[in-house]
Regions:
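Juxtamembrane regions of bacterial inner-membrane/periplasmic proteins
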Residues: 1-244
Length: 244
């Protein structure tokens, strides 16, 4: 029994030490730009493991040198309550939960009506804020477990405590994936439009923002009807997006 308690204590201590390490890294980001993220390193290893060339395009640019159109487009598309929440948008999570439950119920009904007919899996929505996405990409693995989601919540709150909204958005826009080996706003602007992130037009910014949930897929499908339609929607919402 003592051995079991000792083992549990060691695991708890290791978990606490890891979280403290993450928090210290976040605090340092108030003045230091992260050289890479956990997600980026994972992508690099995947490319190397496939014996292909390492594709990595990224160039850090200060917040002031990123088009206001892109900032507004990303907020409008990914997290319209960004400036007001404290890292986690509970209302968005509740809405996502309801949509997912409704979609799963519809799938269950379809399977009951035609059990031998294949049914397309529902699209799962997460309701993650920009801060949560940054916490996940910066520091966490890609696994989908309740423990990792809990870590994401804790780290999102830490990001909001130690960093300003402007700094969070700056780090996010400089590190988010925008295609195969394309990371950050500057690399994306040059890859897709042959211009600096500072000079993106509203339509270009909206299109880049719409790509974010599935950048590799949309990179291969530039003529996607969904991409075009969603771009028009985000263009209409950009004027109401509040910047930090």
């Amino acid at each position: 029994m003592k051995a079991l308690l000792r083992w549990i204590g060691l695991v708890a201590f290791a978990a606490l030490a890891l979280e403290l390490f993450f928090v210290l890294r976040i605090a340092a980001m108030a003045v230091l730009n992260p050289e890479s993220t956990t997600f980026q390193r994972s992508e690099a290893w995947a490319q190397l493991a496939s014996d292909g060339p390492l594709r990595w395009r990224q160039q850090w640019v200060p917040y002031a040198q990123i088009s206001g159109h892109l900032k507004r487009a990303v907020i409008a598309s990914e997290d319209d309550g960004f400036v007001n929440h404290e890292g986690v948008d509970w209302n968005a999570i509740e809405k996502a939960w309801e949509r997912n439950a409704k979609a799963e119920a519809q799938i269950a009904k379809a399977q009951a009506r035609a059990p031998d007919k294949p049914v397309r899996a529902p699209k799962i929505r997460g309701g993650s804020t920009i801060t949560q996405q940054l916490a996940k990409n910066l520091l966490l693995s890609g696994e989908r477990t309740l423990l990792r989601k809990g870590q994401e919540f804790v780290l999102a709150l830490a990001l909001e405590q130690f960093l300003s909204k402007e700094r969070i958005l700056e780090i996010y826009l400089n590190n988010v994936e925008w295609g195969n080996g394309v990371f950050g706003a500057e690399a994306a602007a040059r890859h897709y439009y042959r211009k600096s992130a500072a000079n993106l037009a509203p339509h270009e910014a909206a299109r880049l923002a719409v790509m974010l949930p599935a950048p590799k897929r949309f990179e291969k499908m530039p003529n996607s009807a969904y991409l075009s339609g969603r771009t028009r929607t985000i263009l209409g919402r950009m004027g109401g997006a509040e910047l930090p």
